[in-house]
Each structure stands twice: as C-alpha cells, then as structure tokens.
Amino acid sequence: MLELKGIHKYYNPGTVNEMCLFQNFNLTIDKGEFVSVVGSNGSGKTSMLNIICGSIPVEGGQILINGSDITKQKEYKRNQRIGRVYQNPAMGTCPTMTILENMSLADNKGKRFGLGRGVNKHRVEYYRELLRPLNLGLEDKMHVKV
C-alpha cells in the first residue's frame, strides 16, 4: 500500500513567486489497485511522482509504503522499492549499455548482487518475448547500445 498523508509542497517558499502545489494532500493506493493520474499541464502529476520517488522533498507530511515511513529516505534508497517509467526514456536507461544489459539491470532491481555477470543468459529469451509484442524489432537488437 502507498499512502501520502498531509503532504505540503511549495515552490519558491518565502518569495514573491511562492506557489503552493500541495496543501494537506492525502492519497491511498491499496496493493493491486491500478490508478491513473489525470490533470492539465502544471497541475502536479509529475511532481507528485517525483515526491513519492524522493526526487523532490516535501515541507510536511508523510510518505508510507506498507506502513513504513520513507519520507526522509534518500532517492536511491527508495528506488530499491519503487519502479518508474520516465517521460523521457533516456532518464530510465543507461546509454552506454545494450538493450539486453538495461533490461537485465531493471529485472534485477532490488535484488542482491555481486561481481558476477550482469546478464543472466537464461533470461535472454524471456527478454526477447517481452520485446516482440512491441513490433519494433528490438528483440533482434538486444546487443545494440541504447
């Protein structure tokens, strides 16, 4: 479960350009629930996601995942539990790595790792099957850098 409790977020606080984005904002998303966030440009959709992921700090309130308070956690710590798809695809990939390496990295997110191989050869066909329905030919370009 994801909960936002009493979130307060201001841009440029204490200046003539101060803008209140969220004031006592609350949201609860239960496990397995599918949610669409809809709004006009500048309404705070992306900012809300950035707040949840830790890219933007809040002035007040709590962010809870399964009852655990992550409000003060660093972004990299939250990323162990939160996955996201960026509006700019380049933000969620490593351009010096291949499609296969990027998929493997995402597949292993949150798992323990060592100094072994980064790509599990047993998962390559699985990744191809994930890419095939996109009809972009990416399944044949798995070893091409992003």
Tell me the role of every PLM-derived stretch.
Residues 61-69, 131, 143:
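Conserved ABC transporter NBD signature motif
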Residues 96-112:
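Q-loop/switch helix immediately C-terminal to the Walker
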